[in-house]
């Protein structure tokens, strides 16, 4: 679901449900377990064992931006303008076909993964499969990612080339 599971929503669960597994968890409770959103169905067609192996090659030390603003205007609208001012970031058209998008994910070391319809996004998981490092805003629903290579931030203005390369 794209809906954030809040305390209010969680408290409406029927008593016959002892454990609730969900994406986009926004409330902490023993009976509410966050699970990953995973990759988008259309992206899976481009994913092969060979592609994953090729992703181990050297990557450009840049922050890659490729996302639609309309899926979460509040979290995304300023990001393209802000990061286009830096030589360590690169922006691409969000209408790339899946092959070109997959190639780009594999090419760059860091990928900006702003929240979309939900907090967890397919882009986070596609980035991990491509062997690159997702960069996303910190949230409870993403707490299960703390032991894998993900760069978290509180405010996008905290993201600097030095911070990215220091944290990975």
Predicted segments, located by residue:
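Nucleotide-sugar donor-binding catalytic core of glycosyltransferases
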Residues: 1-152, 163-168
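Short helix-start
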Residues: 155-157
């Amino acid at each position: 679901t794209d809906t954030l599971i809040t305390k209010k929503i969680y408290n409406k669960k029927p008593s016959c449900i002892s454990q609730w597994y969900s994406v986009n968890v926004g409330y902490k409770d023993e009976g509410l377990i966050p699970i990953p959103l995973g990759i988008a169905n259309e992206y899976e067609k481009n994913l092969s064992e060979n592609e994953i192996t090729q992703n181990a090659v050297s990557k450009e030390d840049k922050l890659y931006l490729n996302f639609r603003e309309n899926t979460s205007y509040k979290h995304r609208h300023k990001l393209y303008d802000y990061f286009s001012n830096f030589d360590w970031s690169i922006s691409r058209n969000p209408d790339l076909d899946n092959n070109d998008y997959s190639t780009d994910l594999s090419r760059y070391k860091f990928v900006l993964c702003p929240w979309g319809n939900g907090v967890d996004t397919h882009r986070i998981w596609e980035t991990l499969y491509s062997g690159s490092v997702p960069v996303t805003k910190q949230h409870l629903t993403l707490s299960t990612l703390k032991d894998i290579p993900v760069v978290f931030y509180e405010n996008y203005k905290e993201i600097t080339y030095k911070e990215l390369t220091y944290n990975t």
